[in-house]
Amino acid sequence: MTDLAELARFTAELPFSLDDFQQRACAALERGHGVLVCAPTGAGKTVVGEFAVHLALAAGGKCFYTTPLKALSNQKYTDLTARYGRNRIGLLTGDQSVNGDSPVVVMTTEVLRNMLYADSFALQGLSHVVMDEVHFIADRMRGPVWEEVILHLPDDVRMVSLSATVSNAEEFGGWVQTVRGDTTVVVDEHRPVPLWQHVLVGKRLFDLFDYDSNVDQSPVNPNLLRHIAHCREADRMSDWRNPRRRAGRGSGVRPRFYRSLARPEVIAILDAEGLLPAITFVFSRFGCDAAVQQCLRSPLRLTSEEERAQIAEVIDHRCGDLADADLAVLGYYEWREGLLRGLAAHHAGMLPAFRHAVEELFTAGLVKAVFATETLALGINMPARTVVLERLVKFNGKQHVPLTPGEYTQLTGRAGRRGIDVEGHAVVIWHPSEDTSGPSAVAGLASARTFPLRSSFVPSYNMTINLVHWMSPERAHALLEQSFAQYQADRSVVGLVRGIERCTQVLGDISSELGGPDAPILEYARLRARIAEMERAQSFVFRLQRKQAANDVLAALRRGDIITITHGRHGGLAVVLESARDSSNPRPLVLTEHRWAGRISSADYMGAAAPVGSMTLPKRVEHRQQRVRRDLASALRSAATRLSVPDIGDGVDGDKIGFNDGVLHDPELASLRAQLRRHRSNNAPGLDTQLQQAERYLRIERYNAQLQRKVAAATNSLARTFDRIVGLLIERDFIRGPADDPQVTDDGRLLARIYSESDLLVAECLRTGAWAGLRPAELAAVVSAVLYETRGDDGPGGPVDAEAPTPRLRQALQHTSRLSATLRADEQRHRIALSREPDDGFVGVIYCWARTGDLAAVLAAADASGNGAPLSAGDFVRWCRQVLDLLDQLRNAAPEPDLRATAKRAINDVRRGVVAVDAG
């Protein structure tokens, strides 16, 4: 590779040698190709992205380095400035803008998408774009943005895509090659640090696999299986010897023999085995915090005096800007004590300053045990020697579900620090009550190939309005057809298309045999098929009428009514013992003349005649007693004789039962039957043989049409969604003009500048003046209603203006809610996915914050509101920053100068205190 001068210069500055996959990817990049790199977490994919930065700087061009998360952008900005200096590296996120005109800019993917739609001057001279963590393309919320960027990037820009290992890397690479041109796909499934799988049973740590086995795929460790069998047997014996414990089974009492380890004990075992630092995945924020508290109540200490001094220095640096009044509210002192002992939690509910301090200390090896939610696995650079999984199930917001192989791979991929550890370790804690933590289940997860990448691309209002603005409908359709979603859909119908081709060929052969597609025998067969179809439909309607008539009678029956059961094995006379409880599916309790008692339905009583009479019943009828049934059946027969009830064998006169049988005399059906009788093929020689072939032709024709419908549904779904959205936007005057040449209106240009999940609702609020005349805190509050989502299953509760602190804000919330309801009704009519409804769960909180800046009062008010789960400091900051992002858009896009000025003042009122500290 002597021609690769820049690669030689780049590698000369590295303190390590490149792996083969890194060498191949970098070489392809220097030769002018785009590159897709799929490799495990920690394998060193980012080296390829950093080489793209090197190439851009060496050639005097520009490189944009995109990430899906602001935290990742901040981290990459720090890494690149350490190497190239602050003057050459910029940062653009929703919160920060640093050196935005630098030759290398780190940004979130959304920022680049917005630049592309605005045709920003910053795109001039752009030579390389790095898309880190590109597997986020499968994310429901962020994924579409990635596809928009990939599709809109100029053709001369070299794209470097970095992805975790996915099982369909070749498919994804094939799509990238299709839409971006010459792209080299580099897939490497080799972990640079070997991963050893373990199961912790009680206080004993076992290898999951028998690594000494000579077979190709290591079997489950037999010693582990024997020990678990011994534990289960000991539990059973413990139950057998202790009757009290047997009685407690089912009440949640644990067997005495096996005791689950407390978290401090697990960490102590890992420490003794030399397996720290470790990340323990807990899958709930509360569980992470509780785990640290458990450890703090124990004697566990993992740091030396020297390490504690270094930890204190980092804490003071990270948290020095926090107000003293806020520290106690934030749980600072307990958090600090945990860090000094080498323990920490890590989750999205933490204050960003706290979370970043944990990341820095863990990466430095000063914090030894972190209890984290799975969000830590999403790209944050915090590798550990060991990863511990307490459970192999997690709550997905609705129910507890097992981890998928892809999730297991992503979590355990954190184990093993390249350049530090010789090997990484994954430890699953065994629980006797959970099948998912059994060795076979764990082995299945550990052995499975990783998750497939699935597109989540679907047109949004903002995307649609921008496409209409920049290109014709035909070009927009063509662009949508180039999406990864459409690429996958097209590949999925390959088999269907082949089926259509085979059907078409067979239909042609049969048609030739019968005399062409208009052959008389085919016309005759179609007549027969149409008649049969109409007869089936009439039969269905007739059965429905009979059932409804029977249900009407059954629902009207009263205690003591005598009826005639016309169908089933219980046919004959019966008396009603108890009326039906449910009129939609009436099932009265009856006793028959043959002494059977039970509930009947329309299937037993297919008649519409009124009861034939009635009889007096005792106040209480114990129908389960044989003697009572015998006496009552005798009384029933006597009453029937007295009332001259006809025998069931006489049948029921269909002309008198009240059904609407006019459908049986359908003129169209009569006409078709007449045509069939007169048809020239009716008495043709060899009719039966020809008819069999003709009917086969029709069966294949129907199947072929079914295949074609499936293909059409799969291959045109995005274009149809786009056209429906265009139709709604035309109706609302965001777009005008003929369908073949639509033009974006002033309101449409406003919508094109709003980037939010509720983009169209925000645009409607701006153009209708729903948010006019508000004060800064009120504007921040109403903006939060179109962004905030209550956590858990609580959902938005009550009227959206229920918590409005001022009449002006209440009116704005009501106006917003009405606009949302109208929009959702229009979406339903146009068959578009419904927009989310406004949620008032953050209204009072951010109003209080914008007015007072008092964190203690704000969090106390949030807890007192009872609006879903308690609001953590981290969530509070995160939602405030989302509000800031939309307020910043209003400051630039709102049509009214007063509203723009109010948005600017609202930004200042919200961006203070903990919200302004350590934005990330």
UniProtKB/Swiss-Prot annotation:
One CC-aspect GO term: Ski complex
Pfam families listed in its UniProt record: DEAD, DSHCT, Helicase_C
Biological processes, Gene Ontology terms: nuclear-transcribed mRNA catabolic process, 3'-5' exonucleolytic nonsense-mediated decay
E.C. no: 3.6.4.-
Alphabetic keyword roster: ATP-binding, Helicase, Hydrolase, Nucleotide-binding
Limits of the Helicase C-terminal domain: 265-469
Binding site for ATP: A39, P40, T41, G42, A43, G44, K45, T46
Domain Helicase ATP-binding as annotated: residue spans: 26-184
Keyword RNA-binding among record annotations: no
Tagged with keyword Hydrolase: yes
Entry superkingdom: Bacteria
Annotated GO MF terms: ATP binding; helicase activity; hydrolase activity; nucleic acid binding
Cross-referenced InterPro entries: DEAD/DEAH_box_helicase_dom, Helicase_ATP-bd, Helicase_C-like, P-loop_NTPase, RNA-DNA_Helicase, Ski2/MTR4_C
Family: Belongs to the helicase family. SKI2 subfamily.
Protein name: Probable helicase HelY
Annotated organism of origin: Mycobacterium leprae (strain TN)
Lineage per the UniProt record: Bacteria, Bacillati, Actinomycetota, Actinomycetes, Mycobacteriales
